[in-house]
């Protein structure tokens, strides 16, 4: 076990016995020692980067801007008249989509923010349903749950698919939509919460890209955000992840139908977007998870002999869509990747994918705040539950350990799984138990 500093600050451990730190358990918890001898920052310094914006009042609008948003169930849209991005670019008439569940209490301090992933929408119940319901982490009888959509997404907030108010006929921004940052998202989302009358955030929970947003929310200070749960994430975009995303973007750029981003929204560069998604899906899994899924674990015969019919086929992949036989693991891999890619490409916009992946590259919680990541993490004083998996190939176990050691009042939760980065979805029951216990611990 790692050092148990800071545990005394929290109430007795509420986690169910099944989540106790046992050698072969599903989940392991450890309190991590804080960093010492770090400079002290005032609250004004902590919030300076996040609060330099004008408070404009959003208004509610039912407008649906594109077919991707139209595919969703009903959601709310807040509109902010002017918003200045970190880059200095000013956006006008900015829509921000959000979905909420439950009710605010009288003191308006029972709000739980759920930060979505790269390609998800604000409809959390469609992609994280296990965490919703009475007695679960997101208990709508206790909390006002809200998820706000990010800038650059095709699912309701301002992005490449939304109308440009300064363009002739208000045609969509397309590739002209300016680059945005995770801090931009958090700042504009706070404006929406202010308009809704939220006085204090009980907790912020997010995985992957949502975990990055979760960390940024913490810098509003403990008086506003009481606790955080970053999951499968990082404090700064790594070269490893940046390379994966750049490779995916190049697949889209190289599609002849991309047309420098000036394609018709109903005539997407589908081939490039599908290939990008295939690559992304590989980063979400681990080798053991893929081997197990497709019966390629050690000792299992996965290959097969090449038949005379196969030998006549070209190797350019153009006819591979009809060449798969049930029960053949190699073909099953191809079929799985192709199915997932086609499903995704039919529901997402290429320019939005580029905009959203570029947003990752801006992520660095120390930027403008501190001289190093540990120094920036030490400024987060809220209780924090950090959830990770050793099998995550995108955001490493070591990154989460550093996060835990540097946040003074933190606990590390290690989910025992081979699922890779996708563990927070594939092992949602374990994540639910951990988050629920942590929320109960300090919010009851």
Curated annotation (Swiss-Prot):
This is Acetyl-CoA--deacetylcephalosporin C acetyltransferase. It catalyses: deacetylcephalosporin C + acetyl-CoA = cephalosporin C + CoA. One of its GO terms (molecular function) is homoserine O-acetyltransferase activity. Its EC number is 2.3.1.175. Residues 112-425 form the AB hydrolase-1 domain. The gene is CEFG. GO terms for biological process: antibiotic biosynthetic process; homoserine metabolic process; methionine biosynthetic process. Pathway: Antibiotic biosynthesis; cephalosporin C biosynthesis. Catalyzes the conversion of deacetylcephalosporin C to cephalosporin C. Gene3D superfamilies: alpha/beta hydrolase. It is an enzyme of class 2 (transferase). It comes from Hapsidospora chrysogena (Acremonium chrysogenum). Belongs to the AB hydrolase superfamily. MetX family. The keyword Acyltransferase applies.
